[in-house]
């Protein structure tokens, strides 16, 4: 892939999602955009970039940016971070709140496993300092397909097996 083409697509990923794609991972760009390029009839990634630059189509640009981002996720992917949120962050935020209500936003939440992991952890290991609190968890993502998967919370055997114990 030409360096200029890589730079344009990497910039689109960064602006559209906040995810940086290093030059060493340029093969990911081609792999992630292959289906879109075929569907749209582009022979090369340069043709796709030319289309993005010559025709202002925010819907298509968002689709390309969404295809570029990593969707690697699983339940309890970073259990230590989730524990810190439950044991430290949420109790401090609740103490600072006068409402007894907390809102947690999982930005870049992909298909929802992290948000559901947080909910499971809160259910299983609710600290005394959070009892009685109303906690809302919202997961968002730039990929509409991922957001819909999170909304319906229907996961296959592989997704469930990857991160959840047999006790859950």
Predicted regions and their residues:
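Conserved class I S-adenosyl-L-methionine
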Residues: 98-118, 136-138
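Short, well-ordered amphipathic alpha-helices
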Residues: 84-93, 115-126
């Amino acid at each position: 892939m030409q360096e200029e083409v890589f730079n344009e697509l990497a910039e689109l990923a960064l602006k559209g999602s906040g995810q940086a794609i290093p030059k060493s991972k340029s093969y990911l760009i081609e792999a992630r955009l292959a289906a879109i390029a075929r569907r749209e009839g582009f022979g090369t990634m340069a043709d796709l970039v030319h289309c993005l630059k010559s025709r202002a189509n925010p819907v298509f640009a968002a689709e390309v940016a969404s295809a570029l981002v990593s969707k690697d996720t699983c339940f309890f992917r970073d259990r230590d971070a989730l524990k810190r949120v439950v044991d430290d962050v949420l109790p401090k935020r609740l103490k600072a709140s006068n409402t007894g209500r907390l809102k947690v936003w999982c930005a870049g939440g992909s298909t929802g496993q992290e948000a559901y992991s947080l909910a499971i952890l809160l259910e299983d290991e609710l600290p005394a300092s959070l009892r009685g609190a109303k906690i809302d968890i919202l997961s968002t993502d730039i990929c509409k397909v991922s957001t819909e998967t999170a909304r319906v919370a229907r996961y296959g055997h592989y997704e469930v097996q990857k991160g959840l114990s047999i006790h859950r």
